[in-house]
């Protein structure tokens, strides 16, 4: 693994984060063409998974990416992962957390950083369909949930996946929550997240009246 060296003209995490999201080239070729598959969850809800399979062999490695807070298969990093997978002969899939695929989920729940049971259900189902190596990665919140699953599973995780990786995940949630609620982070990142989270919360309340206090 090579050490990351930021360009001299992008000092600091904020500039690197914002520039990558707004201006970086996501793929070396055309954007990925996803095939969507819908699963019924154990609680009667649904989950959408976006696949890129191309001309890969039946036993090709499968790279599973768990996206970050309010992310999706169209996030800049997801498209970059899809491009990497295609260039290395891998199949690729993004399982969307509840409510993140562009359609509101049905159950009176969303998703969270410690959602390891959801991660385990997804990976177990993919393992049952996959003959080749199964590789799992998570970005930010998705990495938190994946690492929680790996920690809960301990040695048994190796029976399901061949490798796991966490990218830019706020593993110390208390410190991360404190940091994102202050100064520049609050002004930029919190505002960005709330732009989609508030309408989703109100839509969920309309779907399930009385679920929480919408005036709080």
Predicted regions and their residues:
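N-terminal presequences and immediately downstream first alpha-helices
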Residues: 1-26
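N-terminal cap/lid segment of alpha/beta-hydrolase-fold proteins
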Residues: 17-55
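Phosphate/oxyanion-binding active-site loops and adjacent basic polyanion-contact surfaces
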Residues: 45, 74, 112-116
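Short, well-ordered amphipathic alpha-helices
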Residues: 51, 120-124, 146-153
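Short, surface-exposed "cap/lid" segments of acyl-processing enzymes
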Residues: 53-106, 121, 125
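Short glycine-enriched, charge-decorated loop/helix-capping segments at active-site entrances
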Residues: 107-111, 180-182
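Alpha/beta-hydrolase active-site loop
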Residues: 109-129
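Alpha/beta-hydrolase-fold enzymes
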Residues: 130-216
């Amino acid at each position: 693994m090579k050490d990351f060296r930021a360009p001299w003209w992008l000092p600091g995490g904020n500039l690197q984060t914002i520039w990558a999201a707004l201006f970086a080239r996501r793929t070396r070729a055309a954007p990925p063409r996803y095939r969507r598959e819908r699963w019924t969850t154990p609680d009667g809800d649904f989950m959408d998974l976006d696949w890129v399979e191309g001309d890969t062999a039946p036993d090709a490695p499968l790279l599973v990416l768990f996206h970050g807070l309010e992310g999706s298969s169209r996030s800049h990093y997801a498209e970059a992962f899809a491009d990497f997978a295609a260039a290395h002969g891998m199949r690729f899939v993004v399982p969307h957390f509840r409510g993140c695929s562009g359609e509101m989920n049905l159950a009176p729940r969303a998703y969270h950083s410690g959602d390891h049971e959801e991660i385990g259900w997804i990976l177990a189902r993919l393992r049952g369909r996959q003959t080749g190596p199964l590789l799992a990665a998570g970005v930010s919140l998705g990495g938190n949930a994946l690492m929680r699953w790996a920690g809960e599973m301990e040695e048994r995780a190796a029976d399901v996946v061949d490798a796991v990786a966490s990218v830019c995940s706020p593993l110390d949630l208390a410190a991360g929550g404190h940091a994102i609620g202050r100064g520049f982070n609050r002004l930029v990142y919190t505002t960005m997240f709330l732009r989609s989270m508030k309408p989703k919360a109100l839509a969920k309340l309309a779907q399930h009246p009385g679920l929480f206090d919408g005036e709080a």
